[in-house]
UniProtKB/Swiss-Prot annotation:
GO terms assigned for molecular function: 4-alpha-hydroxytetrahydrobiopterin dehydratase activity
High-level lineage: Bacteria, Pseudomonadati, Pseudomonadota, Gammaproteobacteria, Chromatiales
Full protein name: Putative pterin-4-alpha-carbinolamine dehydratase
Protein family (similarity comment): Belongs to the pterin-4-alpha-carbinolamine dehydratase family.
EC number: 4.2.1.96
PANTHER family xref list: PTERIN-4-ALPHA-CARBINOLAMINE DEHYDRATASE (PTHR12599:SF0)
Catalytic reaction annotation: (4aS,6R)-4a-hydroxy-L-erythro-5,6,7,8-tetrahydrobiopterin = (6R)-L-erythro-6,7-dihydrobiopterin + H2O
Keyword Secreted belongs to the record: no
Gene Ontology terms describing biological process: tetrahydrobiopterin biosynthetic process
Annotated keywords: Lyase
A Pfam family reported for this protein in Swiss-Prot or TrEMBL: Pterin_4a
Length: 109
């Protein structure tokens, strides 16, 4: 089953975050994303022609995030949007983060 076919499950905490090796294995499924130096977050910078296109993309990401009940941090500027994903309750990465990343990728930039 692909990540886009899965649904984020609520994380109640008390679960260990992925270690670097696990995260790198999951990253293969979302190759445009990068792992931060602490292996606690994944991120991707999307480029656009202008601010309006970037904002439109952010609004579509918001709809996916609400549907999955998993909310990324988003930086927005002229011609770009950077999406940063982690599971805050465990201060690291969980399968949910990669599911959301795959669904964001499916939106197209």
């Amino acid at each position: 089953m692909s990540l886009t076919d899965k649904t984020c499950v609520p994380c109640q905490g008390g679960v260990a975050p992925m270690d670097r090796q696990q995260a790198e294995q999951m990253l293969v499924q979302v190759p445009e994303w990068s792992l931060d130096t602490d292996a606690r977050m994944i991120y991707r910078r999307f480029k656009f022609r202008n601010f309006i296109d970037a904002l439109s993309f952010v609004n579509r990401v918001t709809e996916v995030a609400e549907a999955e009940d998993h909310h990324p941090d988003i930086l927005l500027g002229y011609g770009y949007a950077e999406v940063r994903i982690q599971t805050h309750k465990i201060e690291g990465l969980h399968e949910n983060d990669f599911i959301l990343a795959a669904k964001v990728d499916a939106l197209g930039a």
